[in-house]
């Protein structure tokens, strides 16, 4: 399949690597090239899922992600962070349909992770909802399939994750950005931590449900 998985992390998030890999292995149901981009700490393997790991001395988050993208030999990239713990089965059928539709409708980013939140959508002549020209999150790190060339264009080397979303979205306001969302999707993941590495509300319930260790 014409798809790679890009996972961003940092040394500080090392306690998340085991539960992330466990839930990824449990709910990601097809073979893909999975690229884990970190900083200086080697990322252990906790499950049967194979990850290609790259440690980068780039000082910025976006600089490291751009190095990871160089290893992606596919036209499309499923881009996520390591504090996203899946509890929804992503199948080969899901991905095949989404990628075919991205090619058919010339989509740059297709968000595939659940309810709209703060995003604003408009109708389109596709099976998906289109982000409005003034949507606050045209760029989002929520689980999405990206056209590789578009992702590279948006990742300025100096960006933090927050710059990527906020500044990146502001630069695309009122442009033909071609970003869409499958709004039929349920919530597909639990966001384990918030700013400051604080555990998210609901972590204990999710941990018990998924039989995960605390971190």
Regions found by a protein language model. Name each.
Residues 1-62, 68-76:
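N-terminal anchoring/stem segment of glycosyltransferases
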Residues 10-13, 40-43, 83-86, 115-119, ...:
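Short, solvent-exposed loop/turn segments at secondary-structure junctions
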Residues 18, 91-99, 161-167:
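Well-ordered, non-membrane alpha-helical segments in soluble/globular domains
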Residues 35-36, 77-79, 108-113, 145, ...:
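A structural signal for short, well-ordered beta-strand segments and their strand-loop junctions
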Residues 75-85:
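Short beta-strand-to-loop acidic/aromatic patch adjacent to the donor-nucleotide binding site
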Residues 88-118:
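Conserved donor-nucleotide/metal-binding helix-loop-beta segment in metal-dependent transferases, i.e.
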Residues 122-136:
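Short, flexible, basic/aromatic active-site loop/helix in glycosyltransferases
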Residues 138-206:
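Catalytic core and acceptor-binding pocket of nucleotide-sugar-dependent glycosyltransferases
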């Amino acid at each position: 399949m014409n798809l790679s998985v890009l996972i961003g992390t940092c040394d500080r998030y090392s306690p998340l690597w085991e539960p992330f890999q466990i839930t990824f292995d449990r709910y990601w149901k097809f073979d893909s090239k999975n690229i884990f981009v970190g900083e200086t700490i080697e990322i252990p393997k906790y499950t049967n899922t194979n990850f290609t790991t790259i440690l980068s001395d780039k000082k910025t988050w976006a600089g490291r992600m751009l190095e990871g993208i160089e290893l992606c030999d596919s036209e499309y990239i499923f881009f996520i962070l390591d504090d996203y713990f899946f509890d929804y089965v992503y199948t080969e059928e899901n991905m095949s349909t989404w990628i075919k539709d991205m090619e058919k409708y010339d989509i740059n980013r297709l968000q595939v992770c659940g309810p709209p939140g703060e995003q604003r959508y408009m109708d389109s002549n596709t099976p998906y909802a289109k982000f409005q020209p003034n949507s606050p999150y045209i760029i989002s790190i929520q689980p999405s399939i990206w056209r590789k060339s578009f992702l590279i264009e948006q990742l300025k080397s100096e960006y933090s994750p927050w710059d990527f979303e906020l500044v990146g979205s502001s630069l695309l306001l009122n442009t033909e950005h071609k970003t869409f969302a499958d709004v039929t999707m349920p919530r597909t993941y639990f966001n384990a931590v918030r700013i400051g590495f604080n555990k998210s509300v609901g972590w204990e319930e999710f941990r018990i449900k998924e039989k995960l260790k605390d971190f």
